[in-house]
Amino acid sequence: MNKFKRSSRRRLPPIRSGEIIDYKNTSLLRRFISEQGKILSRRMNKLTSKQQRLVTVAIKRARILALLPFLNNES
């Protein structure tokens, strides 16, 4: 017997097919940043490796242009 059950329900992808991963799209990029301001891992995001690379580059560009903070000090 297998202890772990897989759900038959298919999860929605975190990035829909129409969404473009761009450094100007800060509302999309904020979903992939932790409360401390760190970039979340691929396992937590459920992204493909290509999507994770694009998200990482976009977040880093947005940080340099001051669209996203490097650290989240709102505590």
Curated annotation (Swiss-Prot):
UniProt-listed Pfam families: Ribosomal_S18
A GO BP annotation: translation
SUPFAM superfamilies, per the entry: Ribosomal protein S18
Positions of disulphide bridges: none
InterPro entries (alphabetical): Ribosomal_bS18 (IPR001648), Ribosomal_bS18_CS (IPR018275), Ribosomal_bS18_sf (IPR036870)
Keywords, in A-Z order: Chloroplast, Plastid, Ribonucleoprotein, Ribosomal protein, RNA-binding, rRNA-binding
GO molecular function: small ribosomal subunit rRNA binding; structural constituent of ribosome
Gene3D superfamilies in the cross-refs: Ribosomal protein S18
Keyword Ion transport: no
Compartments, record wording: Plastid, Chloroplast
A GO cellular-component term linked to this record: chloroplast
Subunit structure: Part of the 30S ribosomal subunit.
Family the entry assigns: Belongs to the bacterial ribosomal protein bS18 family.
Name this protein carries in UniProt: Small ribosomal subunit protein bS18c
Native source species: Anthoceros angustus (Hornwort)
